[in-house]
Amino acid sequence: MVLNCCHFQVLDILELYRRIYEEFLAIPVIKGKKSELEKFAGGLYTTSVEAFIPNTGRGVQGATSHCLGQNFSKMFEINFENEKGEKAMVWQNSWAYSTRTIGVMVMVHGDDKGLVLPPKVASVQVIVIPVPYKDADTQGIFDACNATVETLCEAGIRASADLRDNYSPGWKYSHWEMRGVPLRIEIGPKDLANNQVRAVRRDNGAKVDLPRDCLLKKVEELIENIQDSLFNAAKQKRDACVQIVKTWDEFVVAVSQKKLILAPWCDEEEVEKDVKARTKGEMGAAKSLCSPLEQPEMPEGTKCFASGKPATKWTYWGRSY
């Protein structure tokens, strides 16, 4: 009964980590269980969310949720008095989510211009930049920028205006693009005259003119769309790297092509050690990343890709950070 409670808590925490990655950071991850060789030393088992960096062909252990059982309570004599008045060993879980997450986000979404931040985690979601021309109503443009920021902030959108007069608009564009701000709003004389603003997306560079009388609604829609687009683009790139293999020769080719490999495995520790040894090279050895909790169907008679023994599960493999 207690072990079941521990198991459910492990999965509950793992789901929270998946939500952080996918719903906030717009990074697709795989929920899975680690092999005995890769699990937390001393624990009963380890689950993880695994991310993948298509540009480098490497996996990243995004976060872990461990069931420790009573192993450590026995080791350190951690007791409690149960409802029967008897001494009993505690059951423990452990979970971890570290700053490597920031690095994963940068590598998954970033481009040659700099950071690309998902709106849900961006400290500044919208940057408003005045674009005054010679002999233009500079003060009117600045006032419109401030009014725009005020409107957005009142609605809970994290917005700011860059009103510095010692930098050109073009310099400011590059400055905020490098910092990954999801949406840029430009206001110039023509925009002022037409009661509109120009919005520019960081993720794809798309530009659109927005009427000021429905600005808030349009900005909210853009922010939501940017968040969804980042996740969908990242998932499409990740999925394009997934390769199913069933033989050792196919596995070796997929490793050389920096793929995220899904293969049938016999779940034997010595076989995994052999895979590491046989793929060791300048880029590092391939290893098991996780066995997905949602297992694809295993056809009867399927053999392990590495040993030829009967396969018991599907497992993701690849090089990793």
Where are these regions (language model features)?
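NTP/phosphate- and nucleic-acid-binding module
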Residues: 1-321
